[in-house]
Amino acid sequence: MGDDSEWLKLPVDQKCEHKLWKARLSGYEEALKIFQKIKDEKSPEWSKYLGLIKKFVTDSNAVVQLKGLEAALVYVENAHVAGKTTGEVVSGVVSKVFNQPKAKAKELGIEICLMYVEIEKGESVQEELLKGLDNKNPKIIVACIETLRKALSEFGSKIISLKPIIKVLPKLFESRDKAVRDEAKLFAIEIYRWNRDAVKHTLQNINSVQLKELEEEWVKLPTGAPKPSRFLRSQQELEAKLEQQQSAGGDAEGGGDDGDEVPQVDAYELLDAVEILSKLPKDFYDKIEAKKWQERKEALEAVEVLVKNPKLEAGDYADLVKALKKVVGKDTNVMLVALAAKCLTGLAVGLRKKFGQYAGHVVPTILEKFKEKKPQVVQALQEAIDAIFLTTTLQNISEDVLAVMDNKNPTIKQQTSLFIARSFRHCTSSTLPKSLLKPFCAALLKHINDSAPEVRDAAFEALGTALKVVGEKSVNPFLADVDKLKLDRIKECSEKVELVHGKKSGLATEKKESKPLPGRAAASGAAGDKDTKDVSGPKPGPLKKTPTAKAGGPSKKGKTTAPGGSASAGTKNKKGLETKEIVEPELSIEVCEEKASAVLPPTCIQLLDSSNWKERLACMEEFQKAVELMERTEMPCQALVKMLAKKPGWKETNFQVMQMKLHIVALIAQKGNFSKTSAQIVLDGLVDKIGDVKCGNNAKEAMTAIAEACMLPWTAEQVMSMAFSQKNPKNQSETLNWLSNAIKEFGFSELNVKAFISNVKTALAATNPAVRTSAITLLGVMYLYVGPSLRMIFEDEKPALLSQIDAEFQKMQGQSPPAPTRGIAKHSTSATDEGEDGEEPGEGGNDVVDLLPRIEISDKITSELVSKIGDKNWKIRKEGLDEVAGIINEAKFIQPNIGELPTALKGRLNDSNKILVQQTLNILQQLAVAMGANIRQHVKNLGIPVITVLGDSKNNVRAAALATVNAWAEQTGMKEWLEGEDLSEELKKENPFLRQELLGWLAEKLPTLRSTPTDLILCVPHLYSCLKDRNGDVRKKAQDALPFFMMHLGYEKMAKATGKLKPTSKDQVLAMLEKAKANMPSKPAAPAKAMSKPMGGSAPAKTQPIPAPVEDSVSSTIEAKPDLKKAKAPGVSSKAKSVQGKKVPSKTTLKEDDDKSGPIFIVVPNGKEQRMRDEKGLKVLKWNFTTPRDEYIEQLKTQMSTCVAKWLQDEMFHSDFQHHNKALAVMVDHLESEKDGVISCLDLILKWLTLRFFDTNTSVLMKALEYLKLLFTLLSEEEYHLTENEASSFIPYLILKVGEPKDVIRKDVRAILNRMCLVYPASKMFPFIMEGTKSKNSKQRAECLEELGCLIESYGMNVCQPTPGKALKEIAIHIGDRDNAVRNAALNTIVTVYNVHGDQVFKLIGNLSEKDMSMLEERIKRSAKRPSAAPVKQAEEKPQRTQNINSNANMLRKGPAEDMSSKLNQARSLSGHPEAAQMVRREFQLDLDEIENDNGTVRCEMPELVQHKLDDIFEPVLIPEPKIRAVSPHFDDMHSNTASTINFIISQVASGDINTSIQALTQIDEVLRQEDKAEAMSGHIDQFLIATFMQLRLIYSTHMADEKLDKDEIIKLYSCIIGNMISLFQIESLAREASTGVLKDLMHGLITLMLDSRIEDLEEGQQVIRSVNLLVVKVLEKSDQTNILSALLVLLQDSLLATASSPKFSELVMKCLWRMVRLLPDTINSINLDRILLDIHIFMKVFPKEKLKQCKSEFPIRTLKTLLHTLCKLKGPKILDHLTMIDNKNESELEAHLCRMMKHSMDQTGSKSDKETEKGASRIDEKSSKAKVNDFLAEIFKKIGSKENTKEGLAELYEYKKKYSDTDIEPFLKNSSQFFQSYVERGLRVIEMERESKGRIPTSTGISPQMEVTCVPTPTSTVSSLGNTNGEEVGPSVYLERLKILRQRCGLDNTKQDDRPPLTSLLSKPAIPPVASSTDMLHSKLSQLRESREQHQHSDLDSNQTHSAGTMTSSSSTTNIDDLKKRLERIKSSRK
């Protein structure tokens, strides 16, 4: 008992340390009571126990330890000094409490840790807990994980840093202990609540089963953003206030913290900085000084590649910067200057603040270089100086900038002012104090009086920006002497400025923005209560706790429920079934057979391994049918796939069986519950077949189906490992291709990138180029999701390979990853809340750095190295430092354990040798990058000493120290630096340099923090002393930092801290505080973003990578918003109404709800006029530039803001081109409905469109041009006239695009220029186009010259400005141009003038060189056109038009406009070839506008035709040379009543008058030649082909027999016919409209034409035959393949039946059929086989086998067999399913023939016989055997080989080839030398040219591949005049139809025949097999023509009767028609 009495007397603190456990127990109990009684947290009583708390928790006695833990918990909760014990106590808890068996001890230990977090020691707690994860005891690990999980759940990810936790997670999942793995799973679920993407990406490599389980749990989690349930002490007071205000219904301004966005892992943070200095070429510094610019360029290009890395490692860049600076400043080559500027930009962007030390050296040089005026240089310099500014402060470079302001060069002054303006935009009122503003204002005020307007404008902009930033109060003192006009200009500029930190500033705005917060908080609280309970359990304690409520601490805290448990229970019902993984054991083969036999037919299983492939194929078909019928639940997937794998399995040799197998695998995966076990069975076989040519696609489909069933990440990993375990390069490349597509379809978010990287690297090293290419393609796809950081992983690859990778990445630049369309990604994105996190799968790429292994370097930090670093000799110290740098460089990424290195490096920071200090600092920067976030554990022992170096007297040392501190802070964040007294101790030192740099650093860092440790208050007294420092710079820096300290600490705390100051000082400081309070920025940097995200205000580009159609996107946005508001912010709605319509810059989407519902263009009264006045008065920039600069774009934005809907403006000025397309689509939609708005904003719209002309994206440009065409059409309809301002700011930029290389763009631009003449006088257009002829672009010059010719042709010489003489002299200069197209265009334009004015042109063009004059004279001689004064005559006839052309105000309208437009189009097309300039007469033009305006009455031009010079019919007509066609201008406005006009024109095609027919064909051809107009012909194709075919018959029967008729005219008619048809058959959509009957007649006519001997006798006959040949090929290729094949079969049948038919005819039909057979493999899927087989059946019925054998030639039967064989080969047994249209299959020979053929083809491939058949066919005319042919050809080649007979041999070979065109001479050439082959080919070409040159028609008669020719010569066929060639009896109906046509031609009435039933009714009856001839289709079409003709005549007569004097009367009209009838009768009789 004596012992007991001794310790009982001891004081409490000694009892706690006593060796007896009872004494300690008593001590702990007493201590607990004492702790609970102390009310003051700062009581000195707490300090007594400061060193004992660790012992409380680490007591060896378990019972005593429990009491100690209770006491420790109360101590930590209530003691102010408790934070100092954090490290040792938490370490003790981890090691001595968490391993205890008692649950109570563990719970108390966890509570202690959480309490330390609450008192703001979270990072220390986290650090100790993370150390505990390395403990070997699983219990400790589990407890540490649980503590971290609870801390995260309660305090949130803002307090508990996720980055270090996420990195250790994978290791926990690998633990052997199940409890550790289970707790890790719960932890991963909790982390996922706070940061989804980061944890997903990190855990991709864990066991797939674990990953699957996790994913199932993740899906259950609520989608809403989580909120902390417990708060730090510093936040609790704020929370209490917020709750009170919310309950009182008041506004809570301070409640923004709740809504803070959860901090995401920043991609830039995860990037490893790239060290580029060592990678510079060794000879870089020599090359950069080289005399040759090419060498200097090489050096700069090498640097440019290196600085493209997004993050650069800090280092000594001084030499590099110096070299680049020298190039910028002194190099004479502007291209190199721009390149060097780009390099500087890259350095500044990559180094960020680390580049700041070099900014002062570079800025003056860049500013001086602005004297260079080249746009590309100026732009590069602007980008460089803007990037550099962001690395430094305006204060640092102010002296340099101000020095340049006095430069005499206006460009330098302008650019400097603009730079200042841009810099001011980044400033705030605190960073732009008066002391800094004053010198800038003084300099800028000089500039506003400068003589150069651009300098004045720039100065106004800079002053306006300053005014916007700091307010009028600060700037007005400097503007006292400025006059009112200039002051107004400054204010105007100020209003337009948009600041980087927000458009509006000041407290009012902040208050407005913060008002919705309480409502939103309340709403989300109400809506989210359930979720909160689920996740956090019953823990309201911390929410209501105030600092005063301390009693009973532990009990009040409550117990937190594990989120894994309760959250799971709360969200179980929400789980989606589609994400559940199917798990099944592997079954034995016996079980599989048993299960399969239950669901498959018995024969199916028996025949699986049959030796007969047909049986196996039949078995597969049954298998497939069975699988298709199975239900998901009853499908035994594993059993089925094992059956498929049964021998022969995946080694199946027959490709058809194999294809079926693979297809069945895909079906099973899609339809059944397909598990990974099943997948493992088949994947190996699929990978083996993926490279197979025939089965590869099926294998890919199966793999995709498996990926959907088993998830892509797992499938891809398996497939890749299997593919690269093989050696087959084809399989590898195809696997990579499949993966590329799969990633696009499934998304990227869950892929195990690490596994792929190794395989991709293997692929890149492959010898096979296909594998490498596929790997690079895959990398390109991955780049879409991962971003530029992906490249780092491949930096070690060979340069050539790296350049290919870079090129692939470049292609992907700017593209968005496509939205996933398959797999779970699709469901999860749709299920995600709209505002939740619009991130794309690409976010997964943020953790790419984590893919790289970190290396342990502690073993390399030896004691020898440490002693070297500390050696007395500085050289040895340097060696040691060099070694350390080398070690870190080599490792790149290192682990945090670096041994004794920190101590050694710390010593070197105080080194007397400053070079070594700098080197040490560089090493520390390297260390930060290499170690990453783990560097934070070295902040106290290494980071703080670096801050001491900031006090060094040398600038460069301080700069290096600052760069090091920044590098560390980037990795660690700021909390480590601000915690404790270290920073305040540094600030306390009275070193001006140290204070200056440190305060500047704090001013930079503090604004970015959302919260700071309370220890920041310790710095305040020293901050106040700095405010009074003797050094002005220190005082300034202190003033700059003051608002940011106040931002975090609040005004009250700051004011309270002045209590210890002297009264005088206190007053000064309080005044400064008041001033700082006004400028204090809002504390949280991102609450606005946090609000905008959940409320749907984020950019649509993020959430919708693939833009939806505009209508959908707009409407869906409008509809979706109200739902969003209901769900998320019901409390805000009332306020939204109150602020509706006001321009509040709120980040919520409330303002956007109404935006899209209103008009897109707002009519502002006199808005356009005001803008014109502003531009005229030089208040704004004149729209005149070479390339658009930022200031122009900003100006346009500002101007648009008042009259363009905000949402549309955002789309218009978005950086992504897809948004521009969207904007244009919306503008097109609103064009008609908002005419007034469009016209009022026209100047702005046109300016915006000029910006799009400078885009490189073709789709935007095409869309813009399409919009312009519609716009100018609308303007002309509205009779609008372009103003001078609109024209001058648009036309020059439009003319730039006329030189585009793409034809379609040039064509559109020309069309727009044409339409512009309707809204702007042509005479004013002329100078703009003339200016375009001065371009360096030859295409632009040529097009502009051609356009000038069109204008002159249309408007006469009056259009030439300033005078015709000057204009023509300018045009004539281009005759001597180097470019051929320009010369031709200039010559043609002059010839156009010559055609109008004759020889007068020679006076106007002045003196030309002899060469140019001779070219012009030659061209004029060659011109086929006689001088004509057409425009002059028109001017006489229409004086109004002349007036309008010369008038500025009045423009041509309606009728005259049409006429002018038509003429302009004609002139445009004819100007290139004046010899074809005979005008198409008015009678044959399609005047659709007039038709449309005639109120539905069809008005054809027939009466005019009758009235006009009828005697011309008997005179020779000058036929237009078939060159380039005139373009009809009226098809744009084509509507329903154009059909009658087209019918009328088509009827004229069949006219007996050649001239009429040619004119009609020309009209149709001009339509067919224009893609946008050709659709008008749709529905008229059969009608047109019938009319054309009739014209061919007419030529054959009448014209060719007429000896009086000039055969050249027939050739021209043929040219037009064939040209028309070739144009038609090049348009696939129209060609496919031709029906079978019409095609049959057409082919009949064309083949007969080729056999017409009379054609061959004509001079151009051969050319005609070649043209027909080409046309036949086009018809065969482009027509509907079913129709043409059917037509040919019927034609062959008819030709064989007809006794009069020539054998040659049948042979040509068969040749056509053989060509169709060759096309079948490509067209088989588009053919209706049932119809074709019906035609063959009918053919075989008409020609049975015996009858065919009786034919003279064997080729019909061989043709039929070849066709059937090919069909069998392509379709296989399925062909027998296509006999559905044959009524009696049993009677048909066809079925039996097909069965025989199928049986035969099973045993033989049949390919040999096919080839022999085709060869036989190609020798159809050869009577000799193959051997004889070979002998004959051998003889010819022998002659060619001899010197004497070479020419004779070539001639014979040419004749032979011509006669037997299908003969293959390749075998004879194959064995000869290359020289001999080319000699033979050249010789044949020469002979061909010689023979053709004698009688060649002018170039217009040939058909160029581009189809530039209008009409092509075409011989007709030998068709009988009766219209039928097959010898069949022709019925009377055909004669009647022909009679109707003749009557119509003569204007006679056809009404008497109306009661006759139409012939087409015969077609409805199932007549005999042959296809109905086209003649049968004439009746309905011609009836329509007749009716329209009669309507036209009647309406004309009616209208004529009511006409005034000067028009025809009814009687005269009738007389003329009668006269016409008589004349036509006379013509008809004379022709007979």
Swiss-Prot record:
Its main location: cytoplasm. The keyword Cell cycle applies. HEAT repeats lie at residues 159-197, 356-394, 434-472, 750-788, 855-893, 936-974, 1013-1051, 1284-1322, 1324-1357, 1361-1399. Residues 588-817 are annotated as: TOG 3. Pfam families: CLASP_N, XMAP215_CLASP_TOG. Residues 1441-1450, 1972-1983 have a biased composition (Polar residues). Residues 833-842 have a biased composition (Acidic residues). It comes from the Eukaryota. The modification Phosphoserine is found at S816, S1469, S1861. It is found in: Cytoplasm, Cytoskeleton, Microtubule organizing center, Centrosome; Cytoplasm, Cytoskeleton, Spindle pole; Cytoplasm, Cytoskeleton, Spindle; Chromosome, Centromere, Kinetochore. One of its GO terms (cellular component) is postsynapse. Coiled coil: none annotated. Residues 1932-1957 are annotated as: Interaction with TACC3. Residues 1-223 are annotated as: TOG 1. Residues 853-1081 are annotated as: TOG 4. One of its GO terms (molecular function) is microtubule plus-end binding. Residues 1808-1822, 1984-1997, 2018-2032 have a biased composition (Basic and acidic residues). The keyword Amino-acid biosynthesis does not apply. Residues 268-502 are annotated as: TOG 2. The modification N6-acetyllysine is found at K48. The TOG (tumor overexpressed gene) domains are arranged in a N-terminal pentameric array with each domain composed of six (for the most part non-canonical) HEAT repeats forming a oblong paddle-like structure. Intra-HEAT loops are positioned along a face of the TOG domain and bind to a single alpha/beta-tubulin heterodimer. The TOG domains in the array seem to be structurally and functionally polarized. Differential functions may range from microtubule (MT) lattice binding and/or free tubulin heterodimer binding to potentiating stable incorporation of tubulin into the MT lattice. Interacts with TACC1. Interacts with HNRNPA2B1. Interacts with TACC3 independently of clathrin. Interacts with TACC3 and clathrin forming the TACC3/ch-TOG/clathrin complex located at spindle inter-microtubules bridges. Interacts with NDC80; indicative for an association with the NDC80 complex. Interacts with SLAIN2. Interacts with SLAIN1. Belongs to the TOG/XMAP215 family. Binds to the plus end of microtubules and regulates microtubule dynamics and microtubule organization. Acts as a processive microtubule polymerase. Promotes cytoplasmic microtubule nucleation and elongation. Plays a major role in organizing spindle poles. In spindle formation protects kinetochore microtubules from depolymerization by KIF2C and has an essential role in centrosomal microtubule assembly independently of KIF2C activity. Contributes to centrosome integrity. This is Cytoskeleton-associated protein 5.
